[in-house]
Regions:
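Cytosolic covalent-transfer regions centered on His/Cys nucleophiles
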Residues: 1-140
């Protein structure tokens, strides 16, 4: 799983003012490295407005994404953990995983491995504790 979620793409904060701010913060490492554009971030936010919190896959975990290829310069992921939960359209979130896919299929192997981590309740609880080094070690 090494390389899918490098240390520089993992952030831990105390709290975010709202879910949109959390998505912006979660996306910053990818935007800074020009792996995605602002359009991709805007599209993720618009998707939640249009379709509701469907990106919330399990308690406290949102897999943020938008249409593959649009605003994506390179396949990449980033992670934001908020120690205080953030409300996303009625769903409490502490973990925001941003997935930027270049196309419909090339990201599936990486996504599968990362999702195994987040679907493990014990590991997800450990991630929510917010110790960055522990989180980095889980993914690298």
């Amino acid at each position: 799983m090494e390389g899918y979620l490098p240390k520089k793409h993992i952030k831990v904060i105390e709290q975010a003012s709202d879910w949109k701010s959390a998505v912006l913060l979660a996306s910053q490492p990818l935007l800074k490295e020009k792996l995605i554009t602002q359009e991709y971030i805007d599209n993720m936010i618009a998707s939640v407005h249009e379709h509701g919190p469907y990106m919330v896959l399990t308690d406290y975990f949102a897999l943020m994404h938008a249409k593959a290829g649009v605003g994506v310069n390179e396949q990449s992921m980033s992670l934001l953990v908020t120690k205080s939960q953030v409300d996303m359209e009625g769903k409490p979130i502490k973990i925001f995983l941003v997935l930027a896919a270049k196309d419909a299929t090339s990201h599936l192997a990486a996504l599968s491995q990362v999702m195994e981590v987040f679907m493990d309740d014990d590991v997800r609880e450990t991630i929510m504790l917010g110790d960055k080094e522990t989180i980095v070690n889980i993914f690298n």
